[in-house]
Amino acid sequence: MTAHTPRALLAAALCIALVTACGKKEEPAPAKSPPPTSDSKPSGTLNLYNWNNYIAPETVARFEKEFGAKVVQTYFSDNEEMLAKLAAGATGYDVIVPTSNALEVLIKKGDLQPLDQTKLPNLKNMKPELMNTAFDPGNKYSVPYAYSTTVIGFNDKRMKEAGIDPRGFEALFDPKVACKVKGHITVLDSPDEVFSAAFIYLGIDPNTTSSDDYKRAAEAIKKAKPCWAAFNSSSYIKELSSGNMWLALGYSVDFFQANVDAAAAKQDFKIVAVIPSQGAVLSVDNMVIHKSAPNPALAHAFINFMMEGQNAAELSNLIGSGNANAAAMQFIKPEVKANVSVFPDAETMKKLRQLRLLPAEQRRERGQLWTEIKVQ
Protein backbone atom coordinates (compact mmCIF):
# COMPACT_ATOMS: atom_id res chain seq x y z
CA MET A 1 0.00 0.00 0.00
CA THR A 2 1.05 3.57 -0.44
CA ALA A 3 0.90 4.54 3.20
CA HIS A 4 2.76 2.61 5.86
CA THR A 5 0.98 -0.52 6.99
CA PRO A 6 -1.87 0.07 9.47
CA ARG A 7 -0.92 -0.62 13.04
CA ALA A 8 -2.45 -2.94 15.57
CA LEU A 9 -0.77 -0.80 18.15
CA LEU A 10 0.80 -2.47 21.14
CA ALA A 11 -1.96 -4.72 22.44
CA ALA A 12 0.76 -6.41 24.48
CA ALA A 13 3.55 -3.92 24.04
CA LEU A 14 5.58 -4.45 27.18
CA CYS A 15 5.42 -8.23 26.82
CA ILE A 16 6.66 -7.94 23.26
CA ALA A 17 9.28 -5.39 24.23
CA LEU A 18 10.74 -7.82 26.75
CA VAL A 19 10.92 -10.92 24.59
CA THR A 20 14.32 -12.27 23.67
CA ALA A 21 13.41 -13.65 20.26
CA CYS A 22 10.58 -13.02 17.83
CA GLY A 23 10.94 -15.84 15.34
CA LYS A 24 11.19 -13.56 12.34
CA LYS A 25 13.59 -14.01 9.47
CA GLU A 26 16.82 -12.18 10.16
CA GLU A 27 17.36 -8.98 8.21
CA PRO A 28 20.80 -7.72 7.19
CA ALA A 29 22.58 -5.87 9.96
CA PRO A 30 22.62 -2.09 9.65
CA ALA A 31 25.52 -0.78 7.64
CA LYS A 32 28.60 0.38 9.50
CA SER A 33 29.44 4.05 9.13
CA PRO A 34 33.01 5.03 8.28
CA PRO A 35 34.85 7.24 10.76
CA PRO A 36 33.71 10.88 10.63
CA THR A 37 35.75 13.26 8.55
CA SER A 38 37.22 16.52 9.71
CA ASP A 39 34.57 18.48 7.78
CA SER A 40 32.19 20.65 9.81
CA LYS A 41 29.21 18.66 8.54
CA PRO A 42 28.73 15.10 9.74
CA SER A 43 28.83 12.46 7.02
CA GLY A 44 29.01 8.70 6.59
CA THR A 45 26.10 6.26 6.76
CA LEU A 46 22.74 6.89 8.40
CA ASN A 47 20.88 3.72 9.41
CA LEU A 48 17.16 4.55 9.41
CA TYR A 49 14.61 2.09 10.87
CA ASN A 50 11.32 3.25 9.43
CA TRP A 51 7.87 2.34 8.18
CA ASN A 52 7.79 1.38 4.50
CA ASN A 53 7.19 4.27 2.08
CA TYR A 54 7.43 6.78 4.92
CA ILE A 55 9.94 9.21 3.48
CA ALA A 56 9.92 10.70 -0.01
CA PRO A 57 12.76 9.45 -2.26
CA GLU A 58 13.64 13.01 -3.26
CA THR A 59 14.06 13.92 0.41
CA VAL A 60 16.54 11.09 0.92
CA ALA A 61 18.45 12.06 -2.22
CA ARG A 62 18.69 15.69 -1.12
CA PHE A 63 19.99 14.73 2.33
CA GLU A 64 22.58 12.39 0.85
CA LYS A 65 23.79 15.09 -1.53
CA GLU A 66 23.95 17.83 1.11
CA PHE A 67 25.86 15.73 3.64
CA GLY A 68 27.79 13.41 1.36
CA ALA A 69 26.05 10.63 3.25
CA LYS A 70 24.36 7.32 2.50
CA VAL A 71 20.94 6.52 3.96
CA VAL A 72 20.35 2.80 4.55
CA GLN A 73 16.72 2.03 5.37
CA THR A 74 15.35 -1.02 7.17
CA TYR A 75 11.58 -1.37 7.47
CA PHE A 76 9.09 -2.57 10.05
CA SER A 77 5.39 -3.20 9.44
CA ASP A 78 4.09 -2.37 12.91
CA ASN A 79 5.30 -1.17 16.28
CA GLU A 80 5.23 -4.64 17.81
CA GLU A 81 7.69 -5.91 15.20
CA MET A 82 10.02 -2.99 15.83
CA LEU A 83 9.88 -3.37 19.63
CA ALA A 84 10.38 -7.12 19.45
CA LYS A 85 13.40 -6.79 17.19
CA LEU A 86 15.04 -4.24 19.47
CA ALA A 87 14.22 -6.35 22.55
CA ALA A 88 15.85 -9.34 20.84
CA GLY A 89 19.10 -7.39 20.68
CA ALA A 90 19.08 -5.62 17.31
CA THR A 91 21.48 -2.67 17.35
CA GLY A 92 23.14 -0.24 15.00
CA TYR A 93 20.17 1.95 14.10
CA ASP A 94 20.74 5.69 14.15
CA VAL A 95 17.18 7.01 13.74
CA ILE A 96 13.96 5.09 14.46
CA VAL A 97 10.37 6.28 13.83
CA PRO A 98 8.06 4.84 16.54
CA THR A 99 4.46 5.82 17.20
CA SER A 100 3.91 7.66 20.47
CA ASN A 101 2.81 4.72 22.64
CA ALA A 102 5.74 2.65 21.34
CA LEU A 103 7.95 5.64 22.07
CA GLU A 104 6.71 5.50 25.65
CA VAL A 105 7.96 1.89 25.88
CA LEU A 106 11.38 2.78 24.46
CA ILE A 107 11.80 5.68 26.88
CA LYS A 108 10.84 3.55 29.90
CA LYS A 109 13.29 0.82 28.85
CA GLY A 110 16.16 3.30 28.44
CA ASP A 111 16.62 2.44 24.76
CA LEU A 112 17.06 5.99 23.48
CA GLN A 113 19.74 8.66 23.54
CA PRO A 114 18.67 12.09 24.79
CA LEU A 115 18.59 14.63 21.98
CA ASP A 116 21.12 17.46 21.93
CA GLN A 117 18.71 20.28 21.15
CA THR A 118 21.58 22.68 20.43
CA LYS A 119 22.05 20.64 17.24
CA LEU A 120 18.36 20.98 16.31
CA PRO A 121 17.77 24.67 15.51
CA ASN A 122 14.80 23.75 13.31
CA LEU A 123 12.81 22.79 16.41
CA LYS A 124 11.43 26.31 16.08
CA ASN A 125 9.45 25.10 13.05
CA MET A 126 7.40 22.54 14.97
CA LYS A 127 3.74 22.98 15.92
CA PRO A 128 3.56 23.64 19.68
CA GLU A 129 0.39 21.57 20.13
CA LEU A 130 2.29 18.41 19.13
CA MET A 131 5.32 19.06 21.32
CA ASN A 132 6.03 18.58 25.04
CA THR A 133 3.81 15.53 25.50
CA ALA A 134 3.10 13.77 28.80
CA PHE A 135 5.31 10.81 27.85
CA ASP A 136 8.24 12.97 26.67
CA PRO A 137 8.20 16.32 28.50
CA GLY A 138 10.39 18.90 26.83
CA ASN A 139 10.99 16.54 23.89
CA LYS A 140 14.05 15.14 25.62
CA TYR A 141 14.06 12.06 23.38
CA SER A 142 11.79 12.69 20.41
CA VAL A 143 10.65 15.05 17.68
CA PRO A 144 7.26 14.50 16.00
CA TYR A 145 7.60 13.46 12.37
CA ALA A 146 4.11 12.92 10.95
CA TYR A 147 0.69 11.86 12.11
CA SER A 148 -2.55 10.23 11.07
CA THR A 149 -5.99 10.10 12.62
CA THR A 150 -8.24 7.08 13.15
CA VAL A 151 -11.45 8.24 11.55
CA ILE A 152 -14.51 7.26 9.57
CA GLY A 153 -14.14 6.80 5.82
CA PHE A 154 -17.14 6.37 3.58
CA ASN A 155 -18.47 6.04 0.06
CA ASP A 156 -20.29 9.34 -0.45
CA LYS A 157 -22.74 7.92 -3.00
CA ARG A 158 -23.76 4.92 -0.89
CA MET A 159 -24.15 6.94 2.31
CA LYS A 160 -26.44 9.39 0.55
CA GLU A 161 -28.52 6.54 -0.87
CA ALA A 162 -28.82 4.95 2.59
CA GLY A 163 -29.71 8.22 4.27
CA ILE A 164 -26.82 7.95 6.73
CA ASP A 165 -24.94 10.90 8.18
CA PRO A 166 -21.46 9.38 8.66
CA ARG A 167 -20.01 12.31 10.59
CA GLY A 168 -20.47 10.66 13.99
CA PHE A 169 -19.64 7.30 15.54
CA GLU A 170 -23.36 6.46 15.52
CA ALA A 171 -22.81 5.38 11.92
CA LEU A 172 -20.63 2.52 13.20
CA PHE A 173 -21.97 1.72 16.67
CA ASP A 174 -25.72 2.41 16.62
CA PRO A 175 -27.26 -0.75 15.11
CA LYS A 176 -30.29 1.22 13.90
CA VAL A 177 -27.95 3.26 11.71
CA ALA A 178 -25.15 0.82 10.90
CA CYS A 179 -27.42 -2.02 9.82
CA LYS A 180 -28.83 0.17 7.05
CA VAL A 181 -25.65 -0.82 5.21
CA LYS A 182 -25.21 -4.22 6.86
CA GLY A 183 -22.41 -6.27 5.32
CA HIS A 184 -20.67 -3.21 3.87
CA ILE A 185 -18.86 -1.97 6.99
CA THR A 186 -15.28 -2.81 7.92
CA VAL A 187 -13.37 -1.82 11.05
CA LEU A 188 -9.70 -2.15 11.91
CA ASP A 189 -8.57 -5.48 13.30
CA SER A 190 -7.10 -3.71 16.31
CA PRO A 191 -8.35 -3.71 19.91
CA ASP A 192 -6.56 -0.40 20.48
CA GLU A 193 -8.46 1.33 17.71
CA VAL A 194 -11.88 -0.32 18.03
CA PHE A 195 -12.09 0.02 21.80
CA SER A 196 -10.89 3.63 21.56
CA ALA A 197 -13.58 4.43 18.99
CA ALA A 198 -16.21 2.81 21.22
CA PHE A 199 -14.98 4.79 24.22
CA ILE A 200 -15.21 8.06 22.32
CA TYR A 201 -18.69 7.13 21.07
CA LEU A 202 -19.75 6.52 24.69
CA GLY A 203 -18.16 9.75 25.94
CA ILE A 204 -15.37 7.92 27.79
CA ASP A 205 -11.69 8.92 27.80
CA PRO A 206 -9.94 6.43 25.45
CA ASN A 207 -7.09 6.18 27.97
CA THR A 208 -9.40 4.94 30.71
CA THR A 209 -8.25 2.07 32.90
CA SER A 210 -11.68 1.33 34.40
CA SER A 211 -12.93 -2.25 34.10
CA ASP A 212 -16.51 -0.99 33.97
CA ASP A 213 -15.62 1.28 31.04
CA TYR A 214 -14.08 -1.64 29.16
CA LYS A 215 -17.17 -3.76 29.74
CA ARG A 216 -19.43 -0.95 28.48
CA ALA A 217 -17.31 -0.53 25.36
CA ALA A 218 -17.28 -4.28 24.73
CA GLU A 219 -21.09 -4.37 24.90
CA ALA A 220 -21.33 -1.50 22.41
CA ILE A 221 -19.01 -3.34 20.03
CA LYS A 222 -20.92 -6.61 20.39
CA LYS A 223 -24.23 -4.87 19.61
CA ALA A 224 -22.81 -3.27 16.46
CA LYS A 225 -20.80 -6.27 15.24
CA PRO A 226 -23.72 -8.03 13.44
CA CYS A 227 -23.91 -5.00 11.14
CA TRP A 228 -20.22 -5.22 10.23
CA ALA A 229 -18.71 -7.33 7.47
CA ALA A 230 -15.18 -7.72 8.79
CA PHE A 231 -12.33 -6.72 11.05
CA ASN A 232 -9.78 -5.71 8.43
CA SER A 233 -6.50 -3.82 8.68
CA SER A 234 -4.85 -5.12 5.53
CA SER A 235 -7.11 -4.72 2.50
CA TYR A 236 -9.75 -2.16 3.34
CA ILE A 237 -8.22 0.42 0.99
CA LYS A 238 -8.93 -1.88 -1.94
CA GLU A 239 -12.36 -2.84 -0.58
CA LEU A 240 -13.38 0.81 -0.37
CA SER A 241 -11.91 1.93 -3.69
CA SER A 242 -13.54 -0.99 -5.51
CA GLY A 243 -16.94 -0.22 -4.00
CA ASN A 244 -17.28 -3.46 -2.02
CA MET A 245 -17.20 -1.67 1.33
CA TRP A 246 -19.02 1.58 1.97
CA LEU A 247 -18.15 2.58 5.53
CA ALA A 248 -15.01 1.97 7.59
CA LEU A 249 -13.06 2.75 10.71
CA GLY A 250 -9.50 3.29 9.53
CA TYR A 251 -6.56 5.62 9.12
CA SER A 252 -6.77 9.01 7.43
CA VAL A 253 -3.75 8.25 5.23
CA ASP A 254 -5.43 5.07 4.00
CA PHE A 255 -8.68 6.83 3.12
CA PHE A 256 -6.62 9.39 1.21
CA GLN A 257 -5.12 6.55 -0.83
CA ALA A 258 -8.49 4.84 -1.29
CA ASN A 259 -9.90 8.00 -2.82
CA VAL A 260 -6.88 8.35 -5.11
CA ASP A 261 -7.37 4.73 -6.23
CA ALA A 262 -11.11 5.20 -6.76
CA ALA A 263 -10.48 8.25 -8.93
CA ALA A 264 -7.84 6.37 -10.93
CA ALA A 265 -10.37 3.59 -11.54
CA LYS A 266 -12.92 6.21 -12.70
CA GLN A 267 -15.43 5.22 -10.03
CA ASP A 268 -18.63 7.27 -9.76
CA PHE A 269 -18.07 7.90 -6.04
CA LYS A 270 -15.54 9.45 -3.69
CA ILE A 271 -14.05 8.03 -0.52
CA VAL A 272 -14.39 10.77 2.07
CA ALA A 273 -12.74 10.80 5.49
CA VAL A 274 -14.18 12.66 8.46
CA ILE A 275 -13.19 13.13 12.06
CA PRO A 276 -16.30 12.05 13.99
CA SER A 277 -18.12 14.79 15.85
CA GLN A 278 -17.24 13.15 19.17
CA GLY A 279 -13.49 13.17 18.47
CA ALA A 280 -10.86 10.64 17.34
CA VAL A 281 -7.49 9.07 18.06
CA LEU A 282 -4.37 10.88 16.90
CA SER A 283 -1.32 8.70 16.10
CA VAL A 284 1.95 10.62 16.00
CA ASP A 285 5.13 9.06 14.66
CA ASN A 286 8.36 10.43 16.08
CA MET A 287 12.04 10.59 15.20
CA VAL A 288 14.35 9.24 17.92
CA ILE A 289 17.99 8.20 18.21
CA HIS A 290 18.68 4.67 19.47
CA LYS A 291 21.19 4.18 22.27
CA SER A 292 23.34 2.03 19.94
CA ALA A 293 23.46 4.64 17.15
CA PRO A 294 26.85 4.39 15.40
CA ASN A 295 26.59 7.92 13.98
CA PRO A 296 24.67 10.17 16.42
CA ALA A 297 26.09 13.34 14.85
CA LEU A 298 24.60 12.42 11.47
CA ALA A 299 21.39 11.34 13.21
CA HIS A 300 21.00 14.81 14.70
CA ALA A 301 21.74 16.35 11.30
CA PHE A 302 19.07 14.15 9.71
CA ILE A 303 16.42 15.04 12.29
CA ASN A 304 17.21 18.73 11.90
CA PHE A 305 17.12 18.37 8.09
CA MET A 306 13.69 16.71 8.29
CA MET A 307 12.38 19.69 10.27
CA GLU A 308 13.03 22.06 7.36
CA GLY A 309 9.71 23.09 5.84
CA GLN A 310 10.15 21.74 2.31
CA ASN A 311 11.62 18.45 3.48
CA ALA A 312 8.83 17.91 6.01
CA ALA A 313 6.16 18.70 3.41
CA GLU A 314 7.25 16.05 0.93
CA LEU A 315 5.90 13.14 2.99
CA SER A 316 2.47 14.78 3.28
CA ASN A 317 2.43 15.30 -0.47
CA LEU A 318 3.42 11.66 -1.02
CA ILE A 319 0.93 9.86 1.23
CA GLY A 320 -1.46 12.49 2.59
CA SER A 321 -0.16 12.33 6.15
CA GLY A 322 -0.62 15.01 8.76
CA ASN A 323 2.35 17.25 9.37
CA ALA A 324 3.78 18.37 12.69
CA ASN A 325 5.80 21.16 11.09
CA ALA A 326 4.33 24.66 10.84
CA ALA A 327 6.96 25.71 8.29
CA ALA A 328 5.89 22.86 5.99
CA MET A 329 2.36 24.09 5.46
CA GLN A 330 3.27 26.50 2.65
CA PHE A 331 4.82 23.61 0.68
CA ILE A 332 1.94 21.12 1.05
CA LYS A 333 -0.31 20.65 -1.98
CA PRO A 334 -3.69 22.43 -1.66
CA GLU A 335 -5.65 19.20 -2.19
CA VAL A 336 -3.76 17.55 0.68
CA LYS A 337 -4.03 20.55 2.96
CA ALA A 338 -7.78 20.67 2.29
CA ASN A 339 -8.27 17.23 3.87
CA VAL A 340 -9.98 18.13 7.15
CA SER A 341 -9.49 14.62 8.56
CA VAL A 342 -5.74 15.32 8.53
CA PHE A 343 -5.61 19.09 8.95
CA PRO A 344 -8.63 19.92 11.13
CA ASP A 345 -9.46 23.32 12.56
CA ALA A 346 -8.23 24.26 16.02
CA GLU A 347 -11.46 23.29 17.79
CA THR A 348 -11.53 19.83 16.21
CA MET A 349 -7.84 19.35 16.97
CA LYS A 350 -8.68 19.69 20.67
CA LYS A 351 -10.94 16.62 20.37
CA LEU A 352 -8.08 14.37 19.21
CA ARG A 353 -6.45 12.06 21.75
CA GLN A 354 -3.15 10.20 21.72
CA LEU A 355 -3.22 6.73 23.24
CA ARG A 356 -1.04 5.96 26.24
CA LEU A 357 0.43 2.58 27.12
CA LEU A 358 -2.08 0.56 29.14
CA PRO A 359 -1.08 -1.05 32.45
CA ALA A 360 -0.61 -4.81 32.24
CA GLU A 361 -3.86 -5.63 34.05
CA GLN A 362 -5.93 -3.59 31.62
CA ARG A 363 -4.11 -5.10 28.64
CA ARG A 364 -5.03 -8.57 29.85
CA GLU A 365 -8.64 -7.60 30.48
CA ARG A 366 -8.96 -5.96 27.08
CA GLY A 367 -7.40 -9.00 25.42
CA GLN A 368 -10.00 -11.27 27.00
CA LEU A 369 -12.85 -8.99 25.95
CA TRP A 370 -11.43 -8.75 22.43
CA THR A 371 -11.33 -12.53 22.15
CA GLU A 372 -14.97 -12.71 23.25
CA ILE A 373 -15.91 -10.12 20.63
CA LYS A 374 -14.08 -11.88 17.82
CA VAL A 375 -15.61 -15.31 18.53
CA GLN A 376 -19.14 -13.98 19.08
Segments (PLM) and residue ranges:
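C-terminal motif of bacterial Sec signal peptides marking the signal peptidase cleavage site
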Residues: 18-21
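Early extracytoplasmic/lumenal segment of secretory-pathway proteins
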Residues: 23-25, 30-106
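Extracytoplasmic ligand-binding site segments that recognize negatively charged/polar headgroups
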Residues: 50, 92, 97-242, 258
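Periplasmic-binding protein-like
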Residues: 125, 214-222, 229, 267-291
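Conserved C-terminal helix/tail region of periplasmic/extracytoplasmic solute-binding proteins
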Residues: 238, 346-376
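Mature extracytoplasmic/periplasmic domains
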Residues: 290-351
